[in-house]
Amino acid sequence: MIFSILEHILTHISFSVVSIVLTIYFLTFLVNLDEIIGFFDSSDKGIIITFFGITGLLFTRWIYSGHFPLSNLYESLIFLAWAFSIIHMVSYFNKKKKKNLNAITAPSAIFIQGFAASGLLNMPQSAILVPALQSQWLMMHVSMMILGYGALLCGSLLSIALLVITFRKVGPTFLKKNLKKKFLLNELFSFDVLYYINEKNSILLQQNINFSFSRNYYRYQLIEQLDFLSFRIISLGFIFLTIGILSGAVWANETWGSYWNWDPKETWAFITWTIFAIYLHIKTNRNVKGINSAIVAAIGFLLIWICYFGVNLLGIGLHSYGSFTSS
Protein backbone atom coordinates (compact mmCIF):
# COMPACT_ATOMS: atom_id res chain seq x y z
CA MET A 1 0.00 0.00 0.00
CA ILE A 2 2.77 2.41 0.91
CA PHE A 3 4.64 1.64 -2.32
CA SER A 4 1.48 2.20 -4.36
CA ILE A 5 0.84 5.61 -2.75
CA LEU A 6 4.48 6.62 -3.20
CA GLU A 7 4.34 5.54 -6.83
CA HIS A 8 1.28 7.71 -7.52
CA ILE A 9 2.88 10.69 -5.77
CA LEU A 10 6.11 10.41 -7.78
CA THR A 11 4.14 9.99 -11.01
CA HIS A 12 2.11 13.14 -10.42
CA ILE A 13 5.13 15.16 -9.29
CA SER A 14 7.22 14.28 -12.33
CA PHE A 15 4.31 14.81 -14.74
CA SER A 16 3.34 18.15 -13.16
CA VAL A 17 6.91 19.48 -13.19
CA VAL A 18 7.55 18.51 -16.80
CA SER A 19 4.20 20.11 -17.76
CA ILE A 20 5.32 23.38 -16.18
CA VAL A 21 8.67 23.10 -17.98
CA LEU A 22 6.95 22.64 -21.33
CA THR A 23 4.75 25.67 -20.66
CA ILE A 24 7.85 27.76 -19.94
CA TYR A 25 9.44 26.64 -23.21
CA PHE A 26 6.36 27.69 -25.15
CA LEU A 27 6.41 31.07 -23.40
CA THR A 28 10.00 31.64 -24.54
CA PHE A 29 8.76 31.57 -28.14
CA LEU A 30 6.25 34.34 -27.37
CA VAL A 31 8.33 36.56 -25.07
CA ASN A 32 11.85 37.89 -25.48
CA LEU A 33 14.20 35.31 -23.94
CA ASP A 34 16.52 37.95 -22.53
CA GLU A 35 13.71 39.29 -20.34
CA ILE A 36 12.96 35.92 -18.70
CA ILE A 37 16.38 34.30 -18.77
CA GLY A 38 16.16 33.37 -15.09
CA PHE A 39 12.74 31.84 -15.68
CA PHE A 40 14.18 29.81 -18.56
CA ASP A 41 17.09 28.52 -16.46
CA SER A 42 14.68 27.43 -13.73
CA SER A 43 12.85 25.30 -16.32
CA ASP A 44 16.06 23.36 -16.92
CA LYS A 45 16.24 22.60 -13.22
CA GLY A 46 12.65 21.41 -13.46
CA ILE A 47 13.72 18.63 -15.82
CA ILE A 48 16.29 17.54 -13.23
CA ILE A 49 13.46 17.29 -10.69
CA THR A 50 11.50 15.25 -13.23
CA PHE A 51 14.48 12.97 -13.73
CA PHE A 52 14.74 12.22 -10.02
CA GLY A 53 10.97 11.78 -9.80
CA ILE A 54 10.93 9.17 -12.59
CA THR A 55 14.04 7.53 -11.12
CA GLY A 56 12.29 7.26 -7.76
CA LEU A 57 9.23 5.82 -9.48
CA LEU A 58 11.30 3.13 -11.22
CA PHE A 59 13.17 2.25 -8.02
CA THR A 60 9.90 2.03 -6.11
CA ARG A 61 8.50 -0.50 -8.57
CA TRP A 62 11.85 -2.33 -8.59
CA ILE A 63 11.92 -2.71 -4.79
CA TYR A 64 8.25 -3.66 -4.58
CA SER A 65 8.34 -6.28 -7.37
CA GLY A 66 11.87 -7.57 -6.89
CA HIS A 67 12.74 -7.23 -10.58
CA PHE A 68 13.77 -4.43 -12.94
CA PRO A 69 10.58 -2.55 -13.98
CA LEU A 70 10.49 -3.32 -17.71
CA SER A 71 7.93 -6.12 -17.83
CA ASN A 72 5.01 -4.31 -19.54
CA LEU A 73 4.15 -1.41 -21.81
CA TYR A 74 3.49 1.03 -18.96
CA GLU A 75 6.90 0.46 -17.39
CA SER A 76 8.67 0.67 -20.75
CA LEU A 77 7.01 4.02 -21.48
CA ILE A 78 8.08 5.38 -18.10
CA PHE A 79 11.61 4.17 -18.81
CA LEU A 80 11.47 5.85 -22.24
CA ALA A 81 10.48 9.15 -20.60
CA TRP A 82 13.39 8.62 -18.20
CA ALA A 83 15.71 8.16 -21.20
CA PHE A 84 14.58 11.50 -22.66
CA SER A 85 15.19 13.20 -19.32
CA ILE A 86 18.74 11.79 -19.31
CA ILE A 87 19.38 13.23 -22.77
CA HIS A 88 18.01 16.55 -21.54
CA MET A 89 20.33 16.52 -18.52
CA VAL A 90 23.35 15.80 -20.72
CA SER A 91 22.44 18.79 -22.88
CA TYR A 92 21.89 20.86 -19.72
CA PHE A 93 25.53 20.43 -18.69
CA ASN A 94 26.67 21.11 -22.26
CA LYS A 95 25.80 24.81 -22.33
CA LYS A 96 26.70 25.40 -25.99
CA LYS A 97 24.22 22.95 -27.48
CA LYS A 98 21.45 22.59 -24.95
CA LYS A 99 18.71 24.83 -26.36
CA ASN A 100 18.03 22.88 -29.54
CA LEU A 101 17.87 19.60 -27.64
CA ASN A 102 15.64 21.05 -24.92
CA ALA A 103 12.99 21.86 -27.50
CA ILE A 104 12.89 18.13 -28.36
CA THR A 105 13.43 16.35 -25.05
CA ALA A 106 10.97 18.27 -22.85
CA PRO A 107 7.88 17.83 -25.08
CA SER A 108 8.85 14.20 -25.77
CA ALA A 109 9.12 13.41 -22.07
CA ILE A 110 5.76 14.97 -21.24
CA PHE A 111 3.90 13.32 -24.12
CA ILE A 112 5.32 9.88 -23.39
CA GLN A 113 4.76 10.11 -19.65
CA GLY A 114 1.35 11.67 -20.22
CA PHE A 115 0.33 8.77 -22.43
CA ALA A 116 1.61 6.27 -19.87
CA ALA A 117 -0.31 8.00 -17.07
CA SER A 118 -3.48 8.53 -19.12
CA GLY A 119 -6.63 6.45 -19.04
CA LEU A 120 -5.50 4.53 -22.13
CA LEU A 121 -3.06 2.59 -20.00
CA ASN A 122 -4.02 1.45 -16.53
CA MET A 123 -1.18 1.68 -14.05
CA PRO A 124 -0.59 -2.03 -13.39
CA GLN A 125 0.61 -3.16 -10.01
CA SER A 126 4.05 -4.74 -9.96
CA ALA A 127 3.70 -8.51 -10.12
CA ILE A 128 5.74 -11.67 -10.59
CA LEU A 129 7.31 -11.93 -14.02
CA VAL A 130 5.88 -14.33 -16.59
CA PRO A 131 8.21 -17.32 -17.20
CA ALA A 132 9.46 -15.90 -20.52
CA LEU A 133 10.83 -12.82 -18.71
CA GLN A 134 12.44 -14.55 -15.75
CA SER A 135 16.01 -14.13 -16.94
CA GLN A 136 19.09 -12.08 -16.13
CA TRP A 137 18.94 -10.83 -19.72
CA LEU A 138 15.78 -8.78 -19.04
CA MET A 139 17.59 -5.70 -17.78
CA MET A 140 20.31 -5.87 -20.44
CA HIS A 141 18.09 -6.45 -23.47
CA VAL A 142 15.08 -4.26 -22.72
CA SER A 143 17.00 -1.34 -21.21
CA MET A 144 19.34 -1.17 -24.20
CA MET A 145 16.41 -1.30 -26.62
CA ILE A 146 14.50 1.47 -24.82
CA LEU A 147 17.60 3.67 -24.50
CA GLY A 148 18.21 3.08 -28.20
CA TYR A 149 14.62 4.04 -29.03
CA GLY A 150 14.92 7.21 -26.95
CA ALA A 151 18.18 8.36 -28.55
CA LEU A 152 17.03 7.46 -32.08
CA LEU A 153 13.70 9.25 -31.61
CA CYS A 154 15.48 12.35 -30.32
CA GLY A 155 18.00 12.36 -33.17
CA SER A 156 15.26 11.74 -35.73
CA LEU A 157 13.20 14.65 -34.41
CA LEU A 158 16.25 16.89 -34.82
CA SER A 159 16.54 15.69 -38.43
CA ILE A 160 12.85 16.43 -39.00
CA ALA A 161 13.42 19.94 -37.62
CA LEU A 162 16.34 20.25 -40.04
CA LEU A 163 14.05 19.33 -42.95
CA VAL A 164 11.42 21.86 -41.88
CA ILE A 165 13.98 24.67 -41.68
CA THR A 166 15.65 23.64 -44.95
CA PHE A 167 12.46 23.55 -47.01
CA ARG A 168 11.06 26.72 -45.51
CA LYS A 169 11.11 29.45 -48.13
CA VAL A 170 13.44 32.21 -46.98
CA GLY A 171 14.78 34.55 -49.60
CA PRO A 172 15.50 38.19 -50.42
CA THR A 173 12.00 38.90 -51.82
CA PHE A 174 12.43 42.54 -50.85
CA LEU A 175 15.33 42.73 -53.29
CA LYS A 176 13.22 41.46 -56.18
CA LYS A 177 10.41 43.91 -55.41
CA ASN A 178 12.83 46.85 -55.34
CA LEU A 179 14.30 45.90 -58.71
CA LYS A 180 10.82 45.88 -60.23
CA LYS A 181 10.06 49.27 -58.67
CA LYS A 182 13.30 50.65 -60.10
CA PHE A 183 12.30 49.81 -63.66
CA LEU A 184 8.88 51.45 -63.17
CA LEU A 185 10.43 54.60 -61.70
CA ASN A 186 12.77 54.96 -64.68
CA GLU A 187 9.72 55.24 -66.91
CA LEU A 188 7.82 57.81 -64.79
CA PHE A 189 10.24 60.33 -63.22
CA SER A 190 13.00 62.71 -64.26
CA PHE A 191 16.69 62.24 -63.54
CA ASP A 192 16.82 64.49 -60.40
CA VAL A 193 13.83 62.84 -58.81
CA LEU A 194 15.15 59.41 -59.72
CA TYR A 195 18.55 60.20 -58.16
CA TYR A 196 16.92 61.09 -54.82
CA ILE A 197 14.62 58.07 -54.87
CA ASN A 198 17.44 55.72 -55.83
CA GLU A 199 19.59 57.02 -52.97
CA LYS A 200 16.81 56.26 -50.50
CA ASN A 201 16.15 52.89 -52.05
CA SER A 202 19.83 51.96 -52.04
CA ILE A 203 20.02 52.59 -48.29
CA LEU A 204 16.92 50.50 -47.63
CA LEU A 205 18.13 47.86 -50.05
CA GLN A 206 21.52 47.61 -48.37
CA GLN A 207 19.90 47.31 -44.96
CA ASN A 208 17.61 44.55 -46.23
CA ILE A 209 20.51 42.70 -47.88
CA ASN A 210 22.50 42.81 -44.64
CA PHE A 211 19.47 41.55 -42.72
CA SER A 212 18.83 38.83 -45.30
CA PHE A 213 22.45 37.67 -45.26
CA SER A 214 22.48 37.70 -41.45
CA ARG A 215 19.25 35.72 -41.33
CA ASN A 216 20.44 33.19 -43.89
CA TYR A 217 23.76 32.83 -42.07
CA TYR A 218 21.96 32.12 -38.78
CA ARG A 219 19.71 29.66 -40.62
CA TYR A 220 22.76 27.93 -42.09
CA GLN A 221 24.42 27.74 -38.66
CA LEU A 222 21.24 26.28 -37.13
CA ILE A 223 20.97 23.64 -39.87
CA GLU A 224 24.61 22.65 -39.37
CA GLN A 225 24.13 22.39 -35.61
CA LEU A 226 20.97 20.29 -35.97
CA ASP A 227 22.74 17.99 -38.41
CA PHE A 228 25.70 17.59 -36.05
CA LEU A 229 23.53 16.89 -32.99
CA SER A 230 21.31 14.51 -34.92
CA PHE A 231 24.29 12.51 -36.16
CA ARG A 232 25.84 12.25 -32.69
CA ILE A 233 22.63 11.20 -30.94
CA ILE A 234 21.58 8.74 -33.66
CA SER A 235 25.06 7.18 -33.56
CA LEU A 236 24.68 6.66 -29.81
CA GLY A 237 21.18 5.27 -30.25
CA PHE A 238 22.38 2.91 -32.99
CA ILE A 239 24.97 1.48 -30.59
CA PHE A 240 22.31 0.91 -27.92
CA LEU A 241 19.97 -0.67 -30.47
CA THR A 242 22.71 -2.99 -31.73
CA ILE A 243 23.57 -4.11 -28.19
CA GLY A 244 19.88 -4.62 -27.46
CA ILE A 245 19.33 -6.78 -30.56
CA LEU A 246 22.44 -8.89 -29.92
CA SER A 247 21.59 -9.44 -26.26
CA GLY A 248 18.03 -10.29 -27.28
CA ALA A 249 19.35 -12.89 -29.73
CA VAL A 250 21.39 -14.55 -26.99
CA TRP A 251 18.38 -14.47 -24.66
CA ALA A 252 16.15 -15.96 -27.39
CA ASN A 253 18.61 -18.80 -27.92
CA GLU A 254 18.54 -19.63 -24.21
CA THR A 255 14.74 -19.41 -23.99
CA TRP A 256 13.42 -20.61 -27.35
CA GLY A 257 16.40 -22.52 -28.74
CA SER A 258 17.19 -20.21 -31.68
CA TYR A 259 18.86 -16.81 -32.06
CA TRP A 260 16.29 -15.41 -34.50
CA ASN A 261 12.66 -16.35 -35.13
CA TRP A 262 11.44 -13.54 -37.43
CA ASP A 263 8.41 -12.73 -35.33
CA PRO A 264 6.89 -9.22 -35.89
CA LYS A 265 8.98 -7.51 -33.19
CA GLU A 266 12.27 -8.98 -34.41
CA THR A 267 11.45 -8.23 -38.05
CA TRP A 268 10.64 -4.58 -37.43
CA ALA A 269 13.65 -4.20 -35.13
CA PHE A 270 15.85 -5.48 -37.96
CA ILE A 271 14.20 -3.09 -40.46
CA THR A 272 14.72 -0.18 -38.05
CA TRP A 273 18.35 -1.17 -37.49
CA THR A 274 18.89 -1.35 -41.28
CA ILE A 275 17.40 2.10 -41.89
CA PHE A 276 19.65 3.76 -39.34
CA ALA A 277 22.64 1.79 -40.65
CA ILE A 278 21.84 3.37 -44.04
CA TYR A 279 21.67 6.77 -42.32
CA LEU A 280 25.14 6.33 -40.83
CA HIS A 281 26.49 5.09 -44.16
CA ILE A 282 25.13 8.20 -45.89
CA LYS A 283 26.74 10.43 -43.26
CA THR A 284 30.15 8.90 -43.99
CA ASN A 285 29.84 9.99 -47.64
CA ARG A 286 30.91 13.62 -47.80
CA ASN A 287 29.52 14.02 -51.33
CA VAL A 288 25.95 13.41 -50.15
CA LYS A 289 24.07 16.38 -48.69
CA GLY A 290 22.81 16.32 -45.13
CA ILE A 291 19.22 16.61 -46.31
CA ASN A 292 19.35 13.06 -47.70
CA SER A 293 20.38 11.58 -44.37
CA ALA A 294 17.70 13.67 -42.64
CA ILE A 295 15.03 12.12 -44.88
CA VAL A 296 16.28 8.64 -43.94
CA ALA A 297 16.17 9.59 -40.25
CA ALA A 298 12.59 10.84 -40.67
CA ILE A 299 11.64 7.45 -42.13
CA GLY A 300 13.40 5.80 -39.20
CA PHE A 301 11.29 7.89 -36.81
CA LEU A 302 8.12 6.25 -38.15
CA LEU A 303 9.69 2.79 -38.10
CA ILE A 304 10.63 3.10 -34.43
CA TRP A 305 7.02 3.71 -33.44
CA ILE A 306 5.88 0.81 -35.62
CA CYS A 307 8.48 -1.42 -33.98
CA TYR A 308 7.67 -0.17 -30.48
CA PHE A 309 3.86 -0.10 -30.66
CA GLY A 310 3.16 -2.37 -33.63
CA VAL A 311 3.41 -5.67 -31.76
CA ASN A 312 1.66 -4.15 -28.74
CA LEU A 313 -1.32 -3.22 -30.91
CA LEU A 314 -1.40 -6.60 -32.67
CA GLY A 315 -0.78 -8.70 -29.56
CA ILE A 316 0.81 -11.51 -31.58
CA GLY A 317 4.24 -13.11 -31.76
CA LEU A 318 6.79 -14.09 -29.17
CA HIS A 319 6.81 -10.55 -27.72
CA SER A 320 3.04 -10.35 -27.21
CA TYR A 321 3.40 -10.31 -23.40
CA GLY A 322 3.99 -6.56 -23.63
CA SER A 323 0.77 -5.85 -25.54
CA PHE A 324 -2.00 -3.46 -24.52
CA THR A 325 -4.20 -6.35 -23.50
CA SER A 326 -1.64 -7.73 -21.09
CA SER A 327 -0.66 -4.43 -19.55
Swiss-Prot record:
Subcellular localization: Plastid, Chloroplast thylakoid membrane
Recorded GO CC terms: chloroplast thylakoid membrane; plasma membrane
GO molecular function per UniProt: heme binding
Cited InterPro entries: Cyt_c_assembly, Cyt_c_biogenesis_CcsA, Cyt_c_biogenesis_CcsA/CcmC
Keyword Plastid part of the UniProt annotation: yes
Domain of life: Eukaryota
Pfam short name (any one): Cytochrom_C_asm
Keywords: Chloroplast, Cytochrome c-type biogenesis, Membrane, Plastid, Thylakoid, Transmembrane, Transmembrane helix
Protein's job: Required during biogenesis of c-type cytochromes (cytochrome c6 and cytochrome f) at the step of heme attachment.
Family in the record: Belongs to the CcmF/CycK/Ccl1/NrfE/CcsA family.
Protein name: Cytochrome c biogenesis protein CcsA
Species in which this protein is naturally found: Lobularia maritima
Higher taxonomy: Eukaryota, Viridiplantae, Streptophyta, Embryophyta, Tracheophyta
Encoding gene (name): ccsA
